[in-house]
Amino acid sequence: MWLDRRGWLRVLGHWRYDLRRPSFTRTWSGDKGPMAETVSTQVGTEGGLRASHQQNGDAGGDAKVELSPGPPKPAGREVEPAPVGGEHPSAAAPGPGKHKKRRGATRERVVPPPKKRRTGVSFGDEHFAETSYYFEGGLRKVRPYYFDFRTYCKGRWVGHSLLHVFSTEFRAQPLAYYEAAVRAGRLQLNEKPVQDLNIVLKDNDFLRNTVHRHEPPVTAEPIRLLAENEDVVVVDKPSSIPVHPCGRFRHNTVIFILGKEHQLKELHPLHRLDRLTSGVLMFAKTAAVSERIHEQVRDRQLEKEYVCRVEGEFPTEEVTCKEPILVVSYKVGVCRVDPRGKPCETVFQRLSYNGQSSVVRCRPLTGRTHQIRVHLQFLGHPILNDPIYNSVAWGPSRGRGGYIPKTNEELLRDLVAEHQAKQSLDVLDLCEGDLSPGLTDSTAPSSELGKDDLEELAAAAQKMEEVAEAAPQELDTIALASEKAVETDVMNQETDPLCAECRLVRQDPLPQDLVMFLHALRYKGPGFEYFSPMPAWAQDDWQKD
């Protein structure tokens, strides 16, 4: 090192030390011109070296300026320079005697990062073993079982308490139930028991709610295998059985029945049939086969053919309906013809007429939700026993010609009220706990709560209300009993002291409630074609209208 003419003490490595101002300055050549950096050796009020300054060559317009800190500032709060160019000032450094807050230092609740979710098929032996079936009165029934509902905190829940979320979005149970569930250890937040329902939720919070689950019965009719090879499994789906878990259904679904009774696992549904629709249903055995056939669907290489029985005398000539279809509510699963809807096309041909109803062959050329049912309603010939689109809730004309003298909110209110009175909310893929505001969402599923005029839909069936009224007086005692039950292997019990459903007596559905006269008859694609037998109600001599 040596002194130069300007009083700089030169140091190897392009560093210079200013004897007049205790600081180091380093210069070097950059891509955009000369670069310089100054580091002060003075100890600031924080007890450390002053921050360095850096200039970026000619691009910044100040390459020739060498910055060095001025004289020490008096102790006290430093005045920050005004932001340049509208930029927000950066956070100030801690003052004298202050330390930067460390995470969790103020007992603030720390949320662990979300776990990586499993991809692909999610049902295996551990899921199939949760419970078992039994058969009674022509029905397949599921023994009640314990089940963990798991979810990450939704955006609309952030900043709200658990108490608020349960009281506004999970109304299947009274708040007294959730308080008892906390005492019984049924509610967990980030894998730790919830101690207080007033805890405020944060982003990435992981919720686990252990419930005693009851599933609705379905037909005892077996699922018949139509074909099986190394690529696909094709079955004849009975009416009333959902394809995959949804709503209150889990084990009483085609996916679970095939896994439990036929050891057919890791199946990929290639298309969907409504719960009350019967007929040809295809599954791929691998993701590669699934992608190949879905590509054929997108390229319109597949042909689907259905048969149905409709009201009245359908025209003898072929009828093509191209009316667009709009989803009124994703939650309820209701659609209607509307100019704002997506383009659809269905071709109809009458097969027979028995004087009261007609058997009609249907060829959907597009694949919209409830397409056949909605188009038949528009044509004035709804499916004979369609519980949604042949309902008086649509008005006197039952939606013929697209005439519906109600708003979407009024339509949904009347549909839900009708099926609630019949205790048949499963037809709408609903249970009592789903009856909260926000049933109308015609553009997409909404994350916001719905309108106040749907508040009346939050009421459960009368029997459920009676149980809820009695619950607060009983749940304190029940919670203690539940804690002891857990200790004695409650997971094997079919009754649960906290479960309101266990104290209800529900009537079994009638056989006619488990069938809709819509059947998937044929499914054809490149290199394959599968048929299902014509159902009894589609025969020419059928006379049970």
Curated annotation (Swiss-Prot):
Q: Which residues carry this modification: Phosphoserine?
A: 68
**Gene3D superfamilies recorded:** Pseudouridine synthase (3.30.2350.10)
Modification sites for Phosphothreonine:
477
Function, in words: Pseudouridine synthase that catalyzes pseudouridylation of mRNAs.
Q: Please state what the protein is called.
A: Pseudouridylate synthase RPUSD2
Supply the alphabetized keyword list: Isomerase, mRNA processing, Phosphoprotein
Q: Which InterPro entries match?
A: PsdUridine_synth_cat_dom_sf (IPR020103), PsdUridine_synth_RluA-like_CS (IPR006224), PsdUridine_synth_RluC/D (IPR006225), PsdUridine_synth_RsuA/RluA (IPR006145), RluA_PseudoU_synthase (IPR050188)
What family does the database annotate? Belongs to the pseudouridine synthase RluA family.
Q: Which reaction does it catalyse?
A: a uridine in mRNA = a pseudouridine in mRNA
Q: What is its EC number?
A: 5.4.99.-
Signal peptide region:
none
A molecular-function term among this protein's GO annotations: pseudouridine synthase activity
Pfam families, per database record: PseudoU_synth_2
The encoding gene is: RPUSD2
One Gene Ontology BP term is: mRNA processing
Q: Where is this region: Disordered?
A: 48-121
Active site residues according to the UniProt entry: 274
